């Protein structure tokens, strides 16, 4: 057995006990010698390679509560022609030492690879791809990639034009066989046909030979193999016929030069149309990229300097004039203006900005000159994060693609086998001893089969669907979430900031100003949304705030503070009961009254004596009732989940049309409530702000983070709703359902085309050129069907 040495970067070690624990765990494995260095945070492992895989050691380390460093790289891949290619590359990468997971997308021509940096690197991964016959490079900027694809499209167009010019005369020869029209006799000359077809076969069509050779050399087969074998059979049979004619001069040869040339031309036409259609699938991403400013006006040494955007650094001072885009995320340091943030929030009304306010890159400055300090630049800006989410979603795979991937892996060998069987049956049984009909039928089988349509069926729909959703402010994190969302039958909505605006105001206060001063001073240390409303209310009354000696937040109950040796309690009935503070019937009636109105009522106790009541209300979003109505019309059960008291929650629920309410739930219990719904067989989506309900978002089958501007937690959820518009929640479900429906249509067409087309070709009912045209158009039709999603109404 061969010995192998492996080094892993470990995350989470804090002391020698950690490193010793990991070392002991690894050394308990048979035939393993491990040393863990706390200083370098690395584990060096010697083991017998036949006994273990890298993942075995990672699993052992993770079982102790530590992790192994993983990096991610995106590669552009050139040379893929069909699903067999992408599947081959993906399989090889996933079998590579050090790779955690790799996915290859035929539509975007990219690979997304997660790997252990101490076990492999980008250069090794690129070399691995090159060794199986494809070209790979580290992903360039989206703009550079767009320019490269434009050049590739132009190159494909030029090849198509040349091939068409050479093949057109041969097409006329083919027409003579099926119609009585006359053509110049020179075109029937075998030598002319040879001269016209040879450049098409071996210069224009050389790419098919190269692709076939590379795949066969590595023990696999793809579309190039089918095209190369099929067209070569027609071409070289024609050469054979010419040689027999020159030798015997007995009859005019039966030539198929036109078949090989026209097949190649039609396939090139299909590939060109496919590339053009695929370029349209990234329009949404292109539009996002176009939102970015190209340069910024930076103030240095009291001078204005125009710099490219990539030269701007955090801390730079920028001047933005009216009508200009905000170049980067920043904070206003001087001036007042209004900003159009509709590109991010969907809200058409400009937002007023003054000194100290945050601004978002790529939004539009409307009517005032301002100076800002850059806080986020380059890939860290809000728009860059959005673009990254869209790119990742468009490059990802949906689980529904697995069947197509499995079939594509065996597709070409099966088709070649069917072609051979077809040839044998025809030459032995159908037309015994006749070579031509057998050859023509076999060629038709080879060229009608299309693994491309199978490979494009899912990713093109995912690209267009997620792009269209992004245009509407809905960001899917990946194809798997597009698929998972269409199964959702229950949506759980957090109340504050989701159903309501999240900007509460004080509606009633019963008590004196001294109590209000103590109340506001205590709440000033709290981060709860209601606290801001109380502090603002007290300041508007002209009260000065006092310093807290101590402060404690009691989730689900309220707060406790000490101010000038006085104990202050602010909260609900539970809090008062915990401190044995009695609540009179009159006080309880007042609480019930406020709660019946949908307000949150809190009592203020000073030294265990209730001195006042304050009621705070949060207004319901204008679109909440309509959004919930749309969800219910889609047969989706809507649940409100809140920490607020049941009476207030029921009042808000009644306003918006929610029947199922789960109230008085502590933040840490929200995830448990999601589990209870899932235990009933529900497919649950949780909608919240992604911050204080993150565990519930993670626990749900689909987590949706909803928020405004740069504050929305994109990383916290599977789907991000920009702008805080609750109507985007049903739209997200609609986008998911429409995309999955489109994928199923594509898969049905791709499978059905091959299942029906191959037997028809084998029966000799299709001429090779018709079979080739059908093959070329099959993949185009799949892409065109996916493009229909660009017009879907959400």
UniProtKB/Swiss-Prot annotation:
It catalyses: Cu(+)(in) + ATP + H2O = Cu(+)(out) + ADP + phosphate + H(+). The chain crosses the membrane at residues 161-181, 186-206, 225-245, 255-275, 410-430, 437-457, 747-767, 773-789. Residues 4-69, 71-137 form the HMA domain. Cu(+) 2 binds at residues 82, 85. Its EC number is 7.2.2.8. It is a multi-pass membrane protein. One of its GO terms (molecular function) is copper ion binding. It is an enzyme of class 7 (translocase). Keywords: ATP-binding, Cell membrane, Copper, Copper transport, Ion transport, Magnesium, Membrane, Metal-binding, Nucleotide-binding, Phosphoprotein, Repeat, Translocase, Transmembrane, Transmembrane helix, Transport. One of its GO terms (biological process) is copper ion homeostasis. Mg(2+) binds at residues 689, 693. Involved in copper export. This is Copper-exporting P-type ATPase. The lineage of its organism: Bacteria, Bacillati, Bacillota, Bacilli, Bacillales.
């Amino acid at each position: 057995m061969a010995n192998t040495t492996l080094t892993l970067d470990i995350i989470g070690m804090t002391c020698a006990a950690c490193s010793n624990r990991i070392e002991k765990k690894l050394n308990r494995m048979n035939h393993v010698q491990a040393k863990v260095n706390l200083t370098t945070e690395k584990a060096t492992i010697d083991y017998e390679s036949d006994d273990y895989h890298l993942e075995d050691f990672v699993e052992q380390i993770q079982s102790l509560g530590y992790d192994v460093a993983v990096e991610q790289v995106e590669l552009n891949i050139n040379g893929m022609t069909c699903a067999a290619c992408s599947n081959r590359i993906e399989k090889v990468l996933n079998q590579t030492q050090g790779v955690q997971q790799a996915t290859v997308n035929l539509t975007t021509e990219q690979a997304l690879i997660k790997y252990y940096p101490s076990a492999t690197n980008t250069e090794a991964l690129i070399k691995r791809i090159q060794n199986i016959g494809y070209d790979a490079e580290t992903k360039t900027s989206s703009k550079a990639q767009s320019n490269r694809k434009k050049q590739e499209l132009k190159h494909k167009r030029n090849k198509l034009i040349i091939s068409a010019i050479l093949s057109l005369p041969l097409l006329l020869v083919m027409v003579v066989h099926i119609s009585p029209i006359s053509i110049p006799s020179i075109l029937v000359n075998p030598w002319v046909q040879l001269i016209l077809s040879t450049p098409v076969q071996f210069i224009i069509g050389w790419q098919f030979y190269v692709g076939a050779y590379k795949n066969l050399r590595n023990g696999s087969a793809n579309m190039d193999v089918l095209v190369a074998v099929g067209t070569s059979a027609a071409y070289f049979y024609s050469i054979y016929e010419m040689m027999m004619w020159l030798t015997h001069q007995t009859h005019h040869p039966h030539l198929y030069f036109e078949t090989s040339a026209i097949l190649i031309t039609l396939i090139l036409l299909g590939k060109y149309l496919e590339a053009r259609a695929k370029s349209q699938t990234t329009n949404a991403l292109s539009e996002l990229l176009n939102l970015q400013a190209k340069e910024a006006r930076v103030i240095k040494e009291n001078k204005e300097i125009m710099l490219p955007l990539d030269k701007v650094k955090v801390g730079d001072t920028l001047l933005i004039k009216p009508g200009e885009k905000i170049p980067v995320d920043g904070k206003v340091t001087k001036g007042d203006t209004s900003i159009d943030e509709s590109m991010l929030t969907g809200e058409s009304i400009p937002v007023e900005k003054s000194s100290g306010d945050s601004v978002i890159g790529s939004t539009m400055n409307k009517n005032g000159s301002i100076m800002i300090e850059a806080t986020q630049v380059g890939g860290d800006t809000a728009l860059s994060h959005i673009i990254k989410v869209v790119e990742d979603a468009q490059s990802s795979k949906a689980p529904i693609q697995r069947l197509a991937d499995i079939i594509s892996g065996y597709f070409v060998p099966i088709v070649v086998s069917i072609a051979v069987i077809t040839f044998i049956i025809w030459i032995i049984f159908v037309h015994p001893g006749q070579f031509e009909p057998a050859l023509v039928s076999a060629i038709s089988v080879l060229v009608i089969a299309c693994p491309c349509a199978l490979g494009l069926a899912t990713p093109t729909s995912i690209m267009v669907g997620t792009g269209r959703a992004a245009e509407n402010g809905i960001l899917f994190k990946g194809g798997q979430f597009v698929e998972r969302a269409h199964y959702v039958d229950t949506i759980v909505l957090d109340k504050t900031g989701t159903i309501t605006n999240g900007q509460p105001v004080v509606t009633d206060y019963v008590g004196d100003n001294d109590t209000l001063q103590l109340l506001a001073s205590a709440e000033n240390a709290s981060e709860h949304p209601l606290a801001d409303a109380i502090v603002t209310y007290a300041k508007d009354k002209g009260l000065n705030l006092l310093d807290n000696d101590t402060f404690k937040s009691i989730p689900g109950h309220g707060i406790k503070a000490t101010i000038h040796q006085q104990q202050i309690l602010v909260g609900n009935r539970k809090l008062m009961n915990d401190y044995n503070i009695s609540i009179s019937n009159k006080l309880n009636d007042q609480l019930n009254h406020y709660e019946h109105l949908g307000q949150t009522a809190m009592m203020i106790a000073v030294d265990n004596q209730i001195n006042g009541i304050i009621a705070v209300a949060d207004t319901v979003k204008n679109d909440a009732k309509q959004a919930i109505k749309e969800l219910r019309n889609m047969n989706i059960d809507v649940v409100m989940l809140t920490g607020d008291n049941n009476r207030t929650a029921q009042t808000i629920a009644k306003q918006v049309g929610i029947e199922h309410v789960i109230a008085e739930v502590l933040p840490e219990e929200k995830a448990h409530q999601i589990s209870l719904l899932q235990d009933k067989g529900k497919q649950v989506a949780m909608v919240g702000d992604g911050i204080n309900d993150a565990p519930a978002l993670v626990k749900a089958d689909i987590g949706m983070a909803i928020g405004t501007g740069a504050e929305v937690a994109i990383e916290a959820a599977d789907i991000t709703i920009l702008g805080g518009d609750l109507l985007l929640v049903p739209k997200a479900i609609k986008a998911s359902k429409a995309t999955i429906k489109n994928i199923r249509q594509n898969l049905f067409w791709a499978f059905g085309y091959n299942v029906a087309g191959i037997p028809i070709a084998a029966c000799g009912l299709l001429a090779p050129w018709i079979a080739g045209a059908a093959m070329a158009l099959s993949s185009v039709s799949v892409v065109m069907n996916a493009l229909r999603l660009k017009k879907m109404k959400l």
